[in-house]
């Protein structure tokens, strides 16, 4: 709706009320009624200053009015939001680089500690970035020691956003499968939970250092919102230590570059796209025994926050421990149990037997397939399949039995010299067709027939005779 324009008459009413004690005691409606008779008796010259003042006020308001974009948003507000986002991203990158560089300069890169954290949520508000948390997990990690400690808990917010029960049920059933409030599991006191999280992060990173957690790029907004949801319930004054949420994928990139530099390896082919692709492959996605008991029992380990932070730690170890010659420990750097579910089948060709395509890297020591011992590791079933494949002789089941190499078998197309050739005899053709599965053998010799042989009257005469 367009704003209302200023009126010369209302400018006169406001001036009269400001300069007359009687007008200050009147209401606006009474002043308008009183000044109406005076305005009618005024000449055009007397009304001129008030009308020009109204136009000047319209111009001033138009200059103060904020410009909007095509979505109805203020351009200045949108630019400010973009500027704040760019500054926040730059702060995140500089802080992450500073953490890695300081550890590298102190020759203690393998002992640098990082905390990975993430949330599960029930639902998200439609118009704002408010998330209702459902589960939280954090993991303290270093390259040398692997997973140092894990903090995991379920959250019972007590209620969800009004009118979003269906969305919450759909999101829960397709992901973490946690029961909705009021039947939710876990901690109900949000202030107590937030203090416990702050206490755990302080224990991991020190009382004099900022509280920094790392999570994937697409989860940063959600994790920040869930921390604000818990913090708003805390009135004890511990909220002064703000938890900062940084990008774990950028940490992987910077840490990989630093590790390769320390190891003296060429890092020209390492960029953000390579490290992001490696992180998103999630090689340990189906690892069992690293999720909470609830998700283990309900077969939702992929969406468990405890499983997520543990898999991220395993990914870091798998990607960088080999560069620093760090011995990986089961349960710390890699899963406690590694069960390869592949089977190697020997090929017929000797060249393929020596050039196996199953040779790839596995995190568990001793699980690499070696070419020199490849022939000894074949199972009984694979050997039987290999022997059966070598004894198999293919059979041609086509009906065409003519020799394709003979020029005489094909008709002349005009450019080829014609050659006299007589067709094969009946006995020869019968022998050729005998090997074809879809052509029956003739029960009698082929001979020429006339039209009388198929006549009804001639057939009757033959029967009578």
Curated annotation (Swiss-Prot):
This protein's GO CC annotations: cytoplasm; nucleus; P granule; perinuclear region of cytoplasm
GO MF terms here are:
transcription cis-regulatory region binding
Residue ranges of the region described as Disordered: 415-440
Any one Pfam family match given in the protein's UniProt record, by short name? Maelstrom
| Biological processes, Gene Ontology terms | germ-line stem cell population maintenance; male meiotic nuclear division; negative regulation of DNA-templated transcription; oogenesis; piRNA processing; regulation of miRNA-mediated gene silencing; regulatory ncRNA-mediated gene silencing; spermatogenesis
Please provide the record's keywords in A-Z order: Cytoplasm, Developmental protein, Differentiation, DNA-binding, Meiosis, Nucleus, Oogenesis, Repressor, RNA-mediated gene silencing, Transcription, Transcription regulation
Q: Where in the cell is it found?
A: Cytoplasm; Nucleus
Cite the SUPFAM superfamilies for this sequence.
HMG-box (SSF47095)
Q: Does the keyword Transmembrane helix apply?
A: no
Task: Show the disulfide pairing.
Answer: none
Family to which this protein belongs: Belongs to the maelstrom family.
Function per UniProt = Involved both in the piRNA and miRNA metabolic processes. As a component of the meiotic nuage, plays a central role during oogenesis by repressing transposable elements and preventing their mobilization, which is essential for the germline integrity. Repression of transposable elements is mediated via the piRNA metabolic process, which mediates the repression of transposable elements during meiosis by forming complexes composed of piRNAs and Piwi proteins and governs the repression of transposons.
Spell out the protein name for this chain.
Protein maelstrom
What is the species listed in this Swiss-Prot or TrEMBL entry? Answer: Drosophila yakuba
Its lineage opens with: Eukaryota, Metazoa, Ecdysozoa, Arthropoda, Hexapoda
């Amino acid at each position: 709706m367009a704003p209302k324009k200023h009126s010369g008459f209302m400018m006169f009413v406001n001036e009269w009320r400001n300069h007359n004690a009687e007008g200050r005691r009147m209401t606006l409606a009474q002043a308008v009624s009183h000044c109406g008779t005076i305005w009618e008796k005024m000449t055009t010259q007397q009304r001129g200053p008030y009308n020009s003042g109204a136009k000047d006020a319209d111009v001033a308001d138009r200059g103060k009015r904020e410009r909007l974009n095509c979505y109805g948003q203020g351009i200045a507000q949108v630019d400010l939001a973009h500027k704040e986002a760019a500054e926040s991203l730059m702060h995140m990158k500089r802080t992450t680089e500073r953490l890695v560089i300081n550890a590298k300069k102190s020759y203690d890169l393998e002992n640098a500690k990082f905390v990975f954290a993430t949330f599960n949520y029930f639902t998200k508000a439609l118009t704002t970035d408010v998330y209702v948390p459902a589960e939280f997990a954090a993991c303290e990690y270093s390259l040398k020691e692997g997973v140092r400690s894990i903090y995991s808990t379920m959250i019972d917010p007590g209620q969800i956003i009004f009118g979003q029960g269906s969305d919450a049920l759909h999101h829960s059933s397709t992901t973490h499968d946690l029961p909705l409030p009021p039947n939710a599991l876990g901690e109900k006191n949000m202030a107590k939970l937030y203090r416990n999280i702050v206490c755990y992060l302080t224990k991991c990173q020190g009382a004099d250092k900022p509280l920094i957690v790392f999570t994937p790029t697409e989860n940063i907004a959600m994790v920040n919102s869930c921390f604000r949801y818990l913090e708003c319930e805390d009135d004890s004054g511990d909220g002064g230590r703000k938890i900062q949420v940084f990008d774990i994928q950028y940490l992987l990139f910077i840490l990989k570059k630093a590790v390769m530099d320390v190891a003296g390896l060429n890092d020209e082919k390492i960029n953000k796209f390579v490290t992001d692709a490696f992180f998103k492959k999630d090689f340990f996605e189906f690892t069992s025994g690293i999720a909470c008991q609830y998700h283990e029992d309900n077969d939702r380990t992929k969406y468990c926050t405890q499983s997520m932070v543990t898999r991220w730690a395993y990914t870091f170890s798998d990607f960088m421990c080999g560069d620093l010659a760090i011995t990986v420990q089961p349960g710390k750097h890699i899963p406690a149990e590694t069960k390869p579910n592949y089977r190697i089948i020997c090929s017929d060709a000797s060249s393929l037997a020596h050039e196996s395509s199953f040779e790839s890297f596995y995190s568990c020591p001793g699980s690499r397939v070696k070419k020199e011992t490849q022939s000894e590791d074949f199972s009984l079933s694979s050997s039987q399949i290999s022997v059966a494949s070598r004894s198999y002789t293919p059979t041609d089941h086509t009906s065409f039995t003519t020799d394709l190499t003979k020029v005489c078998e094909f008709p002349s197309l005009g450019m080829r010299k014609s050659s006299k050739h007589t067709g094969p005899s009946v006995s020869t053709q019968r022998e050729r067709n005998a090997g074809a599965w879809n052509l029956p053998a003739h029960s009698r010799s082929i001979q020429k027939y006339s039209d009388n042989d198929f006549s009804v009257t001639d057939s009757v005469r033959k029967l009578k005779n």
